[in-house]
C-alpha cells in the first residue's frame, strides 16, 4: 500500500469511525507527512507496511534536533495512532511505534510574588471599612495557602 493511500484511508477512519475534528485530523496527517517527507528527502523507498522501528527512530532523532519535547510527543502520538490503524486494518502485523517512548515534558514553575510584593499589597488595603478587612483576609489566606 502506498503512503498516500494509507494516509487517506487513515483520515477517513479518523473522521468517520472516531469522529475527530478536522483540526485533529490535519495534525495527524501533518505528523505522518513529516515521516514521509523525511523518507523522500533521504531517498528511502519503503512502504508503510514495511517500515521498521529503526527507520522511525532515525526520523525521530532528526526531529529531536529542531523540535521541542512537546512537539516530539505530538508527532510520536500521531504516528502511533497511524500505525495502530494499519494494524487494525491488517495492513501491518505489528506497530513499530509500540516500543518508542515519548520524551518527558518538563513543567515550568509558576512565577511567585516576593515577600516585599505581598507586603506592598497588604499595605495598600484600606482597613477603614469592612471591605478592607475582607480583602486582607482573602489576600492572607491566598498567601498562606501558597496560591
Regions found by a protein language model. Name each.
Residues 1-147:
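Conserved catalytic core of the tyrosine transesterase superfamily
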Amino acid at each position: 500500500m502506498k503512503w498516500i493511500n494509507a494516509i487517506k484511508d487513515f483520515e477517513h477512519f479518523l473522521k468517520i469511525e472516531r469522529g475527530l475534528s478536522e483540526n485533529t485530523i490535519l495534525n495527524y496527517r501533518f505528523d505522518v507527512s513529516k515521516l514521509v517527507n523525511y523518507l523522500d528527502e533521504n531517498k528511502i523507498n519503503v512502504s508503510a507496511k514495511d517500515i521498521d522501528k529503526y527507520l522511525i527512530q532515525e526520523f525521530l532523532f532528526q526531529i529531536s534536533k529542531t523540535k521541542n519535547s512537546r512537539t516530539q510527543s505530538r508527532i510520536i502520538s500521531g504516528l502511533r495512532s497511524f500505525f495502530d490503524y494499519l494494524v487494525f486494518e491488517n495492513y501491518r502485523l505489528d506497530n513499530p511505534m509500540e516500543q518508542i517512548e515519548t520524551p518527558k515534558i518538563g513543567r515550568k514553575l509558576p512565577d511567585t510574588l516576593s515577600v516585599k510584593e505581598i507586603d506592598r499589597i497588604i499595605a495598600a488595603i484600606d482597613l477603614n471599612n469592612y471591605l478592607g478587612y475582607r480583602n486582607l483576609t482573602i489576600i492572607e489566606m491566598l498567601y498562606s495557602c501558597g496560591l
